UniProtKB/Swiss-Prot annotation:
Membrane topology summary: Peripheral membrane protein
Modified residues (Phosphoserine): S271, S523
Annotated PLAT domain residues: 2-117
Binding site for Ca(2+) 2: T18, D19, N44, D45, E47
Post-translational modification: Serine phosphorylation by MAPKAPK2 is stimulated by arachidonic acid. Phosphorylation on Ser-523 by PKA has an inhibitory effect. Phosphorylation on Ser-271 prevents export from the nucleus. Phosphorylation at Ser-523 is stimulated by 8-bromo-3',5'-cyclic AMP or prostaglandin E2.
Organism: Rattus norvegicus (Rat)
Protein's UniProt name: Polyunsaturated fatty acid 5-lipoxygenase
Length: 673
């Protein structure tokens, strides 16, 4: 009678173990075994983090083992069990069966061996059937739903507990936004201010009451230099929203600025038009905010938005500085162009309005839409169309870890009606919905391809714009990811025809296009992929967006937004319509009140924290791949990333403002916060 040694590994996360009865059946080319109870007398099996081995003897020869079936049956109380993997030592072989899934209730799961296979590689009926059934089950579990009209579709789940267990957080308490924000304010010693809505600060120094306990190197420098034009300009390159600035190739008619207005700022004895031709003028246009409804959820506090246009100049030191700001889109007598030569407080308030507008675009478009929602689309499509045995599922699953869960929690607590977002933000109460609906029309595939996005904004010349660290580091990380995906693609797809004939891949890409991009041709998202090169690029987009791009725009929020005047989440007075009337008192009364300041500070602190046991780029502790060539590619990937870490660390030495958001040792694998 054939005998097998079965080793079962239980996950190490909280509540991963089980006391339920676990049964195993083996399915082979010559037949199926009876189910065997995996149990040792006087031994606590399947404990959290444990590895348990069992000898299983079957009555008849099973032939080549294709599948392992695991069944969980109730002992006393039901407890979920997280199965990492099973290994099987046969008389002639050693087989690994990756799982990395939860088995809930009186559930069962059927596992294939860990060798990645395309659908064309499965010639055995039972394996084809298993592949088809897995996708049929997943497509019932992972359903598309419209969160808001015009948005990319999301997961069909009203709350976190409605999600499939495999994509829920290990501990829901750890991602409770209400609890985390309250904890943040308690830890930051600012909870005494959190209910003081409508109560203004006295002056800029008064903001230090909620700042001094929590400052760090960058936030301290922001506090000390936020009023300076150099600091203002620097943030467009290396702050937490470094994706808006672009080279100005033609002065827009809606910004009627002249050489005479800005000649004091121009250092090359050239006219403004000549500076434009020389490539020294840059622009940031917040047109998307024009006409967006401001938050009206608090009848006691009027809140306001603007849609500024900011003109910037590259001076002789190659630094970017502002030279003209118009606070709304339509030029006119009541919409003056503010200049550095205006009174101190006129110019300062104009810059504050730009910073506030930048905050809104950053939170809702750069961060929410272009990383969170896009990554959720990739994740849902992956689960619906790629079986666990598919090499691209094995590649991508680490990069959508907890993404659907964090977005569901955000819809449940943060971005919902009367949620936390409404408490402090001028775009709460529905404005953020309008913003996403507009921005989706400009969401393109090429804008997610990092090198193309940089080039499209005219920001690709490293000698011409030498201090754009977001660009420099991003390109290094992009190239490392693309090199890795190219290797993986070449292992499983020997030529372009194999790519084109992989129907599961094509269904994945089509799902993203149809449901994520709502079938919008102008998005430029492919409906199909027909070459290895394009597949590598597509996979790079998925991984880069979920990891590097999210890290670049998320984890600097506390650094750049904790000093409230530098990133006001709301403004309590409308933009000035004339020059020479702004006072310091007016600025302070325009800035957020104490309560909203505290909620904002708690938010940017909580959102800037890494998860406990964070997995950073290149870390793949779940061994979905078992083949040697892919494992070797992973090792090379990690070495490339380590080299980038060293390059960035060397550049940052002795810098007063180090840029480290795209250092791979600070880039989580996925959008999970």
């Amino acid at each position: 009678m054939p005998s097998y040694t079965v080793t079962v590994a239980t996950g190490s996360q909280w509540f991963a173990g089980t006391d339920d009865y676990i049964y195993l059946s083996l399915i082979g080319s010559a037949g199926c075994s009876e189910k065997h109870l995996l149990d040792k007398a006087f031994y606590n099996d399947f404990e959290r983090g444990g590895r348990d081995s069992y000898d299983v003897t079957v009555d008849e020869e099973l032939g080549e083992i294709y599948l392992v079936k695991i069944e969980k049956r109730k002992y006393r109380l039901h407890d979920d069990w997280y199965l990492k993997y099973i290994t099987l030592k046969t008389p002639h072989d050693y087989i690994e069966f990756p799982c990395y899934r939860w088995i809930t209730g009186e559930g069962e799961i059927v596992l294939r061996d860990g060798c990645a296979k395309l659908a064309r590689d499965d010639q055995i009926h039972i394996l084809k059937q298993h592949r088809r059934k897995e996708l049929e089950t997943r497509q019932k579990q992972y359903r598309w739903m419209e969160w808001n009209p015009g948005f990319p579709l999301s997961i069909d789940a009203k709350c976190h507990k409605d999600l499939p267990r495999d994509i829920q957080f290990d501990s829901e308490k750890g991602v409770d936004f209400v609890l985390n924000y309250s904890k943040a304010m308690e830890n930051l010693f600012i909870n005494r201010f959190m209910h003081m809505f409508q109560s203004s600060w006295h002056d800029f120094a008064d903001f230090e009451k909620i700042f001094v306990k929590i400052s760090n190197t960058i936030s301290e420098r922001v506090k000390n230099h936020w009023q300076e034009d150099l600091m203002f300009g620097y943030q467009f390159l290396n702050g937490c929203n470094p994706v808006l600035i672009k080279r100005c190739t033609e002065l827009p008619k809606k910004l009627p600025v002249t050489t005479e207005m800005v000649e004091c700022s121009l250092e090359r004895q050239l006219s403004l038009e000549q500076e434009v031709q020389e490539g020294n003028i840059f622009i940031v246009d917040y047109e998307l905010l024009d006409g967006i409804d401001a938050n009206k959820t608090d009848p006691c506090t009027h809140q306001f938005l603007a849609a500024p246009i900011c003109l910037l100049y590259k001076n002789l030191a190659n630094k970017i500085v502002p030279i003209a700001i118009q606070l709304n889109q339509t030029p006119g007598e009541k919409n003056p162009i503010f200049l550095p030569t205006d009174s101190k407080y006129d110019w300062l308030l104009a810059k504050i309005w730009v910073r506030s507008s930048d905050f809104h675009i950053h939170q809702t478009i750069t961060h929410l839409l272009r990383t969170h929602l896009v990554s959720e689309v990739f994740g849902i499509a992956m689960y619906r169309q790629l079986p666990a045995v598919h090499p691209l599922f094995k590649l991508l699953v680490a990069h959508v870890r907890f993404t659907i869960a964090i977005n569901t929690k955000a819809r449940e607590q943060l971005n919902c009606e009367y949620g936390l977002f409404d408490k402090a933000n001028a775009t709460g109460g529905g404005g953020h919905v309008q913003m996403v609906q507009r921005a989706v029309q400009d969401l393109t595939y090429s804008s997610l391809c990092f090198p193309e996005a940089i080039k499209a904004r005219g920001m690709d010349n490293t000698e011409d714009i030498p201090y754009y660290f977001y660009r420099d580091d991003g390109l290094l990380v992009w190239e490392a990811i693309q090199s890795f995906t190219t290797e993986v693609v070449s292992i499983y797809y020997e030529d372009d025809q194999v790519v084109e004939e992989d129907q599961e891949l094509q269904d994945f890409v089509k799902d993203v296009y149809v449901y994520g991009m709502r079938g919008r041709k102008a998005s430029g998202f492919p409906k199909s992929i027909k070459s290895r090169e394009k597949l590598s690029e597509y996979l790079t987009v998925v991984i880069f967006t979920a990891s590097a791009q999210h890290a670049a725009v998320n984890f600097g929020q506390y650094d750049w937004c904790s000093w409230i005047p530098n990133a006001p989440p709301t403004m309590r007075a409308p933009p000035p319509t004339a020059k020479g009337v702004v006072t310091i008192e007016q600025i302070v009364d325009t800035l957020p009140d104490r309560g909203r300041s505290c909620w904002h500070l708690g938010a940017v602190w909580a959102l800037s924290q890494f998860q406990e046991n964070e997995l950073f780029l290149g870390m793949y502790p779940e061994e979905h791949f078992i083949e040697k060539p892919v494992k070797e590619a992973m090792i090379r990937f990690r070495k490339n990333l380590e080299a980038i870490v060293s390059v960035i660390a060397e550049r940052n030495k002795n810098k007063k403002l180090p840029y480290y958001y795209l250092s791979p040792d600070r880039i989580p694998n996925s959008v999970a916060i």
